[in-house]
Regions:
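A recognition module on extended beta-rich or small alphabeta surfaces enriched in W/G with H and D/E
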Residues: 114-128
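Sensory/regulatory domains in signal-transduction proteins
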Residues: 1-115, 144
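Short hydrophobic short-linear motifs embedded
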Residues: 125-143
Length: 144
């Protein structure tokens, strides 16, 4: 789970055991965008912004470098996470390697990405929806 805080580099709020093992350390509080090579940082930050602000899911292909210099291919799924109104924006997701047996990974690079879903419908409270439909002069019947 990532916090939507661009100034801090979108830090991890919580990270699972497998993700921490892939990166060789506990990720809580560490910057997500700092995992990426400098030439991919801006792109991943743009993807995070689209997922959070437009409430769209994103799937990305990532290539990382292992400790022995071999490339490792991963898949990233980012989903908007908005539990309640007036709570901080955050994201949840999945980072999974293709194949296994990778040592600690570094220097992530985006190879591809796409957005899933459609523009969500804005939900308006029911009372306001009724008022948007009602136009002009209205007569309400009262008790007789």
């Amino acid at each position: 789970m990532l916090s939507y805080d661009g100034a801090a580099g979108y830090p991890f709020r919580v990270a699972g055991t497998r993700v921490c093992a892939l990166l060789g350390c506990d990720l809580k509080g560490r910057s997500f965008s700092a995992l990426f090579a400098p030439d991919s940082r801006r792109e991943i930050e743009d993807i995070i912004a689209v997922v959070s602000e437009e409430m769209l899911a994103a799937v990305a292909g990532i290539t990382a470098t292992s400790q022995d210099g071999a490339p490792a291919h991963l898949e990233l799924l980012l989903l908007p996470f908005n539990a309640r109104a007036h709570t901080p924006l955050s994201l949840t997701g999945l980072l999974a390697p293709f194949g296994g047996g990778h040592s600690v990974l570094r220097d992530f690079k985006l190879t591809s990405w796409r957005y899933l879903g459609h523009q969500p419908q804005k939900t308006v409270p029911r009372a306001l929806r009724k008022m948007a439909i009602a136009r002009g002069f209205m007569v309400y019947e009262g008790p007789r």
